């Protein structure tokens, strides 16, 4: 980051970059100012009018960035955000990043150019520095659904959720599971998988790495991941998918392979979307309080904008058992 490379505080960097040429000397010596400007230029920094505008005015506008609003979970998160915003006479607008860092960056800058009071990100990547850069610039923001570093985040306790799925399958006698893990850049995939693996390891049944398959979160990716599991190793007696849609795709792949759910393979999803309960074989799923996450994210952001500050929140998951994890035969 600019402050680290220049050897000064984030506050000094923020003041120098926010000031005009004739005012920068108030905050640092000429050599330090020159170093900050040079590093900022090399890193592609664009001056953000946002932080300065917050000192004098409020737009009562919040920007929201999600991977795909057509995703039921993200749509429900946004519903909670917008509901809480309406109650506080704040407007929101939302845009998709498609989980592409370059698009996330461009659309973030576009929102900031519109002088939003702050931003809510539902598309945080564990390996992308954008959020650290925004924090250095003094931009108020909150993460929702996903976490990154020590930034304020409103999430489900996904490690606990993964454990719930594992404990349920262990109680059903399932000893050879595989995991449809999602993408490694998303904390939801990482944390849910971690909780699941920890619970199985503690039960004396550690999973080999090849039993954890990283693919996307939609049904097509779930089908592809399940086909890889069936092709590359022995048939598992259980599948844990870190997303309901991936689980439903996995169910289709199992059916096409002539395997029965739950007799041959038990199946657990995550988020408990309405689709989980409506299929021909109702899906056991870990319920995540996504609507409440959205409300709390908006409330937390406004607290930060108002100078009151906010802390990260972990909301409790709940396992909803259905037909896809019926009793293990024998």
PLM regions: where:
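Hinge/beta->alpha junction and helix N-cap segments in small-molecule ligand-binding domains
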Residues: 49, 66-76, 94-103, 128-129, ...
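Short beta-strand segments enriched in small/hydrophobic residues
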Residues: 5, 10-15, 54-69, 168, ...
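Periplasmic-binding protein-like
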Residues: 116-123, 178-181, 212, 233-243, ...
């Amino acid at each position: 980051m600019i402050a680290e490379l220049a050897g000064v505080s984030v506050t000094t960097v923020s003041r120098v970059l926010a000031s005009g040429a004739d005012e920068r000397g108030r905050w640092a010596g000429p050599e330090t100012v020159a170093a900050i400007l040079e590093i900022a230029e090399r890193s592609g920094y664009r001056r953000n009018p946002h932080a300065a505008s917050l000192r004098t005015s409020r737009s009562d506008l919040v920007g929201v960035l999600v991977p795909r609003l057509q995703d039921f979970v993200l749509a429900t998160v946004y519903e909670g955000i917008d509901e809480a915003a309406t109650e506080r006479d704040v407007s929101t607008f939302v845009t998709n990043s498609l989980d592409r860092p370059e698009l996330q960056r461009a659309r973030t800058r576009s929102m900031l150019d519109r002088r939003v009071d702050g931003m809510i990100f539902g598309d945080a990547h564990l390996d992308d520095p954008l959020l650290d850069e925004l924090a250095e610039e003094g931009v108020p923001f909150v993460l929702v659904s996903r976490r990154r570093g020590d930034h304020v985040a409103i999430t489900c306790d996904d490690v606990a959720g993964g454990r719930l799925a594992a404990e349920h399958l262990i109680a059903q006698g399932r000893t050879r599971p595989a995991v449809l893990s999602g993408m490694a850049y998303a904390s939801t995939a990482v944390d849910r998988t971690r909780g699941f693996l920890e619970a199985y390891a503690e039960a004396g049944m550690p999973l080999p790495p090849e039993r954890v398959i990283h693919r996307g979160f939609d049904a097509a990716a779930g089908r592809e991941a399940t086909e890889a599991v069936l092709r590359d190793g022995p048939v598992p007696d259980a599948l844990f998918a870190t997303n309901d849609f991936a689980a439903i795709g996995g169910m289709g792949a199992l059916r096409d392979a002539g395997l029965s759910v739950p007799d041959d393979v038990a199946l657990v999803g995550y988020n408990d979307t309405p689709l989980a309960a409506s299929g021909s074989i109702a899906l056991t799923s870990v319920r995540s309080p996504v609507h409440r996450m959205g409300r709390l994210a908006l409330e937390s952001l406004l607290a930060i904008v108002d100078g009151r500050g906010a802390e990260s929140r972990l909301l409790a998951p709940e396992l909803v058992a259905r037909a896809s994890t019926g009793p293990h035969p024998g």
